[in-house]
Amino acid sequence: MGCFSLLCLHNLKDWEGLEKIESDTEYFRVPGLFDKIELTKNQLGNAARPRNEEWRVMSEKMKKAEEEAYGMVVNTFEDLEKEYIEGLMNAKNKKIWTIGPVSLCNKEKQDKAERGNEAAIDEHKCLNWLDSWEQNSVLFVCLGSLSRLSTSQMVELGLGLESSRRPFIWVVRHMSDEFKNWLVEEDFEERVKGQGLLIRGWAPQVLLLSHPSIGAFLTHCGWNSSLEGITAGVAMITWPMFAEQFCNERLIVDVLKTGVRSGIERQVMFGEEEKLGTQVSKDDIKKVIEQVMDEEMEGEMRRKRAKELGEKAKRAMEEEGSSHFNLTQLIQDVTEQAKILKPM
């Protein structure tokens, strides 16, 4: 989680105004932030205030551990959210070391390919496929390793990608039997053969995002994925699912202004995907793809901001960069603290 989302949730946990908001769909302004950020209760779910006993117990344990901690290590970098890093330090009254993006520690192509897990597809096949497309033309779609959509929403997403007529890579970690049947019955993969590549299972995300042909990233807004997209310098379509991901969406869209919302309005809880059904239609998916890949001034400015952030991310991890300095400072601080706490 980044400092922006950590501060969002910190400010909401004890905010009395949250209880006064009767509707789960009413937008309200998050208090105590530098930017105007609006969310709904449906988007927060259990993130700000646990709605059941299991989440409440876990939240209390996390709060206790945080209070006892000497400081916090955060996978982010100063140029990304400087005001929110300082705001979180003041709110928590804790030291914070920002040492990211940690994905940049994987410098070799093989390391990037194997980051997180073993890929379900040969990396050379992916790269050769990407090589066949123009620079900044391909949409990379990946909703994370834990996220699941209803069968109807998966179908709408597939149809939206197809109707956009834009080249895409679609990574699908989880498929219902109904969706597998739909792929076969509709001959979907054959239909999009000249346009899209479907990857079943784990994909080398960091490696693929760094390819020059990638022009945008449709993401679930998990923090690691969000930061990997930022580091790659690409614009994003935000499709948050649960936890703090709606906060991450607001950072990308409203603060950094490098992304476009897909239109998701409520969290998808585990096991309730089919009950929730479809949130975004194929037509709306097509529209948002056109918006993020737009070659007019708005789209160009969005891509320019994204590219500049990607360059700043890389500089942060260099020897003279802020994250490199903070990592050195972390080692020194922990060493000094250990000396103080060492029994005589």
Curated annotation (Swiss-Prot):
It is found in: Cytoplasm; Nucleus. One of its GO terms (cellular component) is cytoplasm. Its EC number is 2.4.1.-. GO terms for molecular function: UDP-glucosyltransferase activity. This is UDP-glycosyltransferase 73C4. Probable glucosyltransferase that cannot glycosylate abscisic acid (ABA) and auxin (IAA). Belongs to the UDP-glycosyltransferase family. It is an enzyme of class 2 (transferase). The lineage of its organism: Eukaryota, Viridiplantae, Streptophyta, Embryophyta, Tracheophyta. UDP-alpha-D-glucose binds at residues 145, 202-203, 220-228, 242-245. Expressed in flowers and fruits. CDD domains: GT1_Gtf-like. It comes from the Eukaryota. Keywords: Cytoplasm, Glycosyltransferase, Nucleus, Transferase. Its main location: cytoplasm. SUPFAM superfamilies: UDP-Glycosyltransferase/glycogen phosphorylase (SSF53756). Pfam families: UDPGT.
